[in-house]
Amino acid sequence: MRLTDIEIEQCLDNGTIIIDPRPGIEAISGVSVDVRLGSQFRVFKDHTAPYIDLSGPSAEMQIALDRIMSDKIEIADDQAFFLHPGELALAVTYESVTLPADIVGWLDGRSSLARLGLMVHVTAHRIDPGWQGKIVLEFFNSGKLPLALRPGMTIGALNFERLSSAVARPYNTRKSSKYKDQQEAVASRISQDK
């Protein structure tokens, strides 16, 4: 069942869910906790690659990904990152989140931002039980105007569901976890898929 604001506060108080820095009471509403935008981004560089073969040999795929993905971009707190129409960028939340093995989290974008064309996650909005780290945001601007995104702005909301039991393989204990303890906007690691 989805956790209510009262249950979320209890989980934060007893350390079942850890959000660092801990959100203020004003960030917790009926069934969610607001999260803010961090200061790290990654974008797709201009490139001449005609495509990326997502089922090709891992080494070739990694070379193509390295060629098109930028290094980490750090934005100062008083500056903005501009996301232009049709662009995809990666970023991270300001907050780091730790979930136990019996709670799954979900990231939702804000309706007010979606009405301007901003998608906060392209498809990956589940936060696995056992997750520990910052949440990567997959921004896409489907609107007509560039959007200025500033570190610290409220960018989305997390909600949580308690599972019927703890999972047998929490995210942070699996050897195959590609984004374990993530603290920055990590590029796709699809080439590590088995």
From Swiss-Prot:
Pfam families: DCD (PF22769). Its EC number is 3.5.4.13. Keywords: Hydrolase, Nucleotide metabolism, Nucleotide-binding. The keyword Hydrolase applies. InterPro entries: dCTP_deaminase, dUTPase-like_sf, dUTPase_trimeric. DCTP binds at R110, S111, S112, L113, A114, R115, D128, V136, L137, E138, Y171, K178, Q182. The active site is at E138 (proton donor/acceptor). The keyword Nucleotide-binding applies. GO terms for biological process: dUMP biosynthetic process; dUTP biosynthetic process; nucleobase-containing small molecule interconversion. Residues 174-194 are annotated as: Disordered. Pathway: Pyrimidine metabolism; dUMP biosynthesis; dUMP from dCTP (dUTP route): step 1/2. One of its GO terms (molecular function) is nucleotide binding. It catalyses: dCTP + H2O + H(+) = dUTP + NH4(+). Belongs to the dCTP deaminase family. HAMAP family: dCTP_deaminase. PANTHER family: DCTP DEAMINASE (PTHR42680:SF3). NCBIfam families: dCTP_deam (TIGR02274). Homotrimer. Catalyzes the deamination of dCTP to dUTP. This is dCTP deaminase. It comes from Shewanella frigidimarina (strain NCIMB 400). The gene is dcd.
